Curated annotation (Swiss-Prot):
Mg(2+) binds at residues 199, 213. This is Succinate--CoA ligase [ADP-forming] subunit beta. It comes from Azoarcus sp. (strain BH72). ATP binds at residues 46, 53-55, 99, 102, 107. One of its GO terms (molecular function) is succinate-CoA ligase (ADP-forming) activity. Succinyl-CoA synthetase functions in the citric acid cycle (TCA), coupling the hydrolysis of succinyl-CoA to the synthesis of either ATP or GTP and thus represents the only step of substrate-level phosphorylation in the TCA. The beta subunit provides nucleotide specificity of the enzyme and binds the substrate succinate, while the binding sites for coenzyme A and phosphate are found in the alpha subunit. The keyword ATP-binding applies. NCBIfam families: PRK00696.1, sucCoAbeta. Keywords: ATP-binding, Ligase, Magnesium, Metal-binding, Nucleotide-binding, Tricarboxylic acid cycle. Heterotetramer of two alpha and two beta subunits. Its cofactor is Mg(2+). Residues 9-244 form the ATP-grasp domain. Substrate binds at residues 264, 321-323. GO terms for biological process: succinyl-CoA metabolic process; tricarboxylic acid cycle.
Length: 386
């Protein structure tokens, strides 16, 4: 689960991390009022969407008068903001953050994250703040410092000092940086985040350290422990089909291809998508029905896939372990009839009650194409949609 920047800063402030003063707004008048309340001579008008690259996309502007704040807020609020993370369709800006200006002397990057390659908790920092960290990792990997943290010991002073010195924090500001790093790590652990990122972390002209921007990703499986985090959820920022799928315990992610995929098990689902790509087509979605799929779940899965106008065919790939093939077959037949399926459907199933499942499909009277292997299934569905 993702949250907005202003919400991320609220979370950080609860742990003692210093951020600029800011006020979230939902209208132009609120934006002007917020600037008046904050005072000063310069304000930052920031679009709030669940995507990075907002500045490059025109979603972050400086206002040097209240009239300018009003103009900028009017331009940004309601715009379809396109960044490298939103895709070409962009995301609509429905809320703003009006923030006091900052005297930026230097920008850094710091994050606490789950390092999948090593299966460890890591603290990562760079002297190249304010940039896309993936870009830095690709072009100048030597400018990224990473330390691995023992969860039982936590981030030690020595590790935090190593990070601060490694990214060039001035000696006088190292104690503040160390304090910020340790608070960020504690926040990351206690909120069950998979990523807690400050980018940029700034050094001000007076030597103070502040979190100028922040981003969190939270482990959705741990949200039951954090109702205060769940309260931050903004459904407007999420895919409507993904929200609908979650109501039926379906793991669904929309993609850009034209072949719908319905699979049981995340690993098999990813292998299925890879196989589709291998045979020259693109998957339209990731969809894992899990090990306890019912006829209702399968029907809803079909409905969700077919909402996407780009879907020209569907591939069902089932391994019958916990899930019985005849159960899936019954669900597939019922779903195809209920939605009046009009696109090609290829079904490949192996495992428990496989023969019974194939019999149900064969006797359904529907034009369902059977396959025995993943390669055969992919070949057939790709041929059907071309």
């Amino acid at each position: 689960m993702k949250i907005h920047e202003y919400q991320a800063k609220e979370v950080l402030r609860k742990y003692g991390v210093v951020t600029p003063r800011g006020i979230p707004c939902f209208s132009v008048d609120e934006a002007v009022k917020a600037a008046e309340e904050l005072g000063g001579k310069i304000w930052v008008v920031k679009a709030q969407i669940h995507a990075g690259g907002r500045g490059k996309g025109g979603g972050v502007k400086l206002g040097k008068s209240l009239d300018e704040v009003r103009t900028l807020a009017g331009q940004i609020l309601g715009m379809q903001l396109v960044t490298h993370q939103t895709g070409p369709e962009g995301q609509k800006v429905r809320r703003l953050l009006i923030e006091e200006g900052a005297d930026i002397k230097k920008e850094y990057y710091v994050a606490a994250l789950t390092d999948r390659a090593t299966q460890k908790v890591a603290m990562m920092a760079s002297s190249e703040g304010g940039m896309d960290i993936e870009e830095v990792a690709h072009n100048t990997p030597e400018k990224i410092i990473k330390v691995f943290v023992d969860p039982l010991a936590g981030l030690t002073d020595a590790q935090a000092i190593e990070l601060a010195k490694g990214i060039g924090v001035p000696e006088a500001s190292i104690p503040q940086a160390v304090d910020t790093f340790k608070k960020l790590y504690t926040c990351y652990m206690e909120t069950d985040a998979s990523l807690a990122e400050i980018n940029p972390l700034i050094l001000e002209g007076n030597g103070n350290i502040k979190a100028l921007d922040a981003k969190f990703n939270f482990d959705s499986n741990a949200l039951f422990r954090h109702p205060e985090i769940v309260a931050y959820r903004d459904l407007d920022e999420e895919d409507a089909d993904e929200i609908e799928a979650s109501k039926f315990d379906l793991a669904y992610i929309s993609l850009d291809g034209n072949i719908g995929c319905l699979v049981n098990g995340a690993g098999l689902a990813m292998a299925t998508m890879d196989t589709i790509k291998l045979f020259g087509a693109e998957p339209a979605n990731f969809l894992d029905v899990g090990g306890g799929a019912t006829t209702e779940k399968v029907t809803e899965a079909f409905k969700i896939m077919l909402k996407n106008p780009k879907v020209k065919g569907i591939l069902v790939n089932i391994f019958g372990g916990i899930m019985k093939c005849d159960t899936i077959a019954t669900g597939v037949v019922a779903a195809a009839k209920e939605v009046n399926l009009s696109v090609p459907l290829v079904v490949r199933m192996k495992g428990t009650n496989e023969d019974l499942g194939k019999k149900i499909l064969a006797e359904s009277g529907l034009p369902i194409i059977s396959a025995d292997t993943m390669a055969e299934a992919a070949t057939k569905i790709v041929a059907e949609v071309k």
